């Protein structure tokens, strides 16, 4: 997970200190999801199908600045990225 895999493994990642608890919770939700519909709750996830350069990906929000982007295939998330959208 490109430098943030430690978040999922309960390690502290200095770059993400301000969002680590929320990001960890969202990564766990993503890991546990059996379908995209599972990610619609809570509504704050704001599950979106992305377009443009990220066509084929989906995202859930960590906060107003950060999103977790991923490709959903065969009931699992692949190519997971924690992305600064600003």
Predicted regions and their residues:
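Enriched for short, Lys/Arg-rich terminal
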Residues: 51, 57-86
């Amino acid at each position: 997970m490109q430098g943030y895999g430690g978040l999922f493994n309960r390690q502290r990642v200095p770059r993400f200190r301000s969002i680590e608890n929320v990001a960890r919770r969202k990564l766990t939700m993503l890991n546990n999801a059996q379908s995209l519909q599972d990610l619609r709750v809570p509504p704050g996830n704001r599950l979106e199908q992305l377009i443009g350069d990220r066509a084929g990906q989906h995202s859930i929000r960590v906060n107003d600045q950060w999103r977790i982007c991923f490709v959903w295939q065969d009931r699992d998330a692949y190519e997971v990225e924690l992305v600064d959208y600003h």
